[in-house]
């Protein structure tokens, strides 16, 4: 038995916490994660960018990055010009995965050049979301929906 280092990100927060779990048994790991998440026993735990909840054998793992959320799925709406598209994602999905889906959407009719410039922003804001961040980071606590705007604005020069 070896220690497992777990990076825990809780829905609606911008930072994560590291916890060292002295067991690689799934039940012990989930209990430690849920304690950090402070969302109770009904909290769902996902490995980063995974669609399914954390399960299986962790014995051979030395580190793990997880997302803790009250949501099993997040209903994501992406708006572009006067159109909107919707899809359910795991709370552990990254902004990059949502961006690839939205920019590649047939509804928005983006060519390859436009897809390369595309970014996601929160409505009413000006800064693009970090592509490696998870969608759970932008949730209002315990709400299982997220609205994002797709923009083609150039952010490379500030």
Regions found by a protein language model. Give the residues of each.
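Ubiquitin system architectures
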Residues: 1-158
